[in-house]
Amino acid sequence: MARLSQVSPDELILDLENPRIPDARFANEIEAIAYLYSQADLGELIQSIGNSGWLDFEPLIVEESTRTVIEGNRRLAALRIIANHQLQQRFKVTLPKPLHLNAKPDEIQVNYVGSRNEARDFIGFKHVNGAFKWDSYAKAKFAHS
């Protein structure tokens, strides 16, 4: 059964076998972050968190025994870059100035699960049948209002 908790992002591990990236496996977190940065609009997410702060409204789903993030790898990768100057240099990321006070949270909300199978229903709904993706105009209009 899932269990809600607060945890330091530093204690979590990116999923090196992320099913959303079926054609790639990573040797380490740096490779996973590089892929997410180049292929999954991580730059936009970093800027959003940098400007508005971490919004803890949707818990990451984490396999408790391994601390592996099953759902929320983009968000964790963004936090990793925001918190690490060497990663910022590697990916040529310029953070907003001033950086929002809550852009580097000490703790984030996670939903611990016992296994990947326990998380499948939620992840399947979100990513297979999930919310309709907004186009650029809709995003801009919402941000402006």
Name what the model sees in each region.
Residues 26-36, 94-145:
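Amphipathic, charge-rich alpha-helical segments that serve as recognition/docking helices
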Residues 1-98, 107-109:
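Short, charged/polar connector segments at secondary-structure boundaries
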